[in-house]
């Protein structure tokens, strides 16, 4: 990973404005705060200009939709693009529900986010590829996941983080795989949302290189989860989350570099 981004977060304490999934709002706030960022949750469009002005990045999660949050998302995103602040989007369950597809299409029409983080099914929708999704879960498909991520990145003209047992990060021209992690991520509701929150923290200190920010966020999170699981006598989901927070609080860039299983994928244009 980049040697400096994690340290930069701890030094700069970037403010992250979040429209969060109500199911995981505390998890996202905790993970951002623990690595050194300063999370703010926003729900009223009246505060959008100031919320964006004080922030170094905006994170949008469509996990729990209703009319007011949708209006807030659109208002904040429009303001973030006006103020040239980086935006991260998490298109939760977009592959399964037509209404969510309509909303994400409207959000993406406002401008181009720096990073989109999703599972295989969600990213396949953004790529325009067929995939059998299963609600918020990734589901299954026959298409190579690297191709899914690269196609989505080119179509949306952004950095894609396709998270799963192996994370795939691509801007459509360069692609990286992160093989660290643990199966406990798949049984903990909120793992993806936390990773999205980390992407916002990393891109806040690397707005001109969202691809590297996404790699560093994914690697940090995956290594932390792996270290926790390996240290547990019996890896269990109930005790995994608090220990994950402790690990993220203590982890250093050197720790991540020591354990990272990161490979670059050769891309044929």
Swiss-Prot record:
UniProt-annotated binding residues for ATP: 117, 163
Domain of life: Bacteria
CDD domains: THZ_kinase
Key words of the record: ATP-binding, Kinase, Magnesium, Metal-binding, Nucleotide-binding, Thiamine biosynthesis, Transferase
Residues annotated as binding substrate: 41, 190
Keyword rRNA processing tagged: no
Molecular function as annotated in GO: ATP binding; hydroxyethylthiazole kinase activity; magnesium ion binding
Record's catalysed reaction(s): 5-(2-hydroxyethyl)-4-methylthiazole + ATP = 4-methyl-5-(2-phosphooxyethyl)-thiazole + ADP + H(+)
Enzyme class, UniProt record, top EC level: transferase
EC number in record: 2.7.1.50
HAMAP family from the UniProt entry: Thz_kinase
Name listed for the protein in its UniProt record: Hydroxyethylthiazole kinase
Organism of provenance: Latilactobacillus sakei subsp. sakei (strain 23K) (Lactobacillus sakei subsp. sakei)
């Amino acid at each position: 990973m980049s040697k400096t981004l994690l340290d930069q977060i701890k030094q700069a304490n970037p403010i992250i404005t979040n429209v969060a999934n109500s199911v995981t709002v505390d998890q996202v706030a905790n993970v951002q705060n623990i690595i050194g960022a300063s999370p703010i949750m926003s729900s009223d469009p009246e505060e959008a200009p100031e919320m964006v002005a004080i922030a170094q990045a905006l994170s949008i999660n469509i996990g729990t939709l209703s009319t007011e949050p949708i209006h807030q998302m659109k208002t904040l995103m429009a303001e973030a693009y006006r103020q040239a602040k980086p935006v991260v989007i998490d298109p939760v369950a977009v592959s399964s529900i037509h209404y969510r597809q309509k909303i994400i299409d409207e959000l993406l029409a406002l401008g181009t986010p720096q990073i989109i983080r999703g599972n295989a099914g969600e990213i396949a929708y953004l790529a325009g590829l067929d995939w059998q999704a299963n609600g918020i879960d990734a589901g299954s498909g026959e298409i190579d996941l690297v191709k899914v991520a690269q196609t989505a990145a080119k179509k949306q003209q952004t950095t894609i983080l396709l998270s799963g047992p192996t994370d795939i990060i691509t801007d459509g021209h360069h692609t990286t795989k992160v093989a660290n992690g643990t199966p406990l991520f798949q049984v903990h509701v909120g793992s993806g949302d936390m990773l999205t929150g980390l992407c916002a923290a990393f891109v806040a200190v690397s707005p001109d290189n969202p691809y590297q920010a996404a790699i560093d966020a994914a690697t940090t999170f995956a290594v932390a989860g792996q270290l926790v699981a390996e240290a547990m006598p019996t890896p269990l989901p109930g005790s995994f989350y608090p220990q994950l927070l402790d690990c993220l609080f203590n982890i250093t860039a050197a720790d991540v570099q020591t354990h990272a299983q990161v490979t670059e994928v050769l891309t044929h244009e």
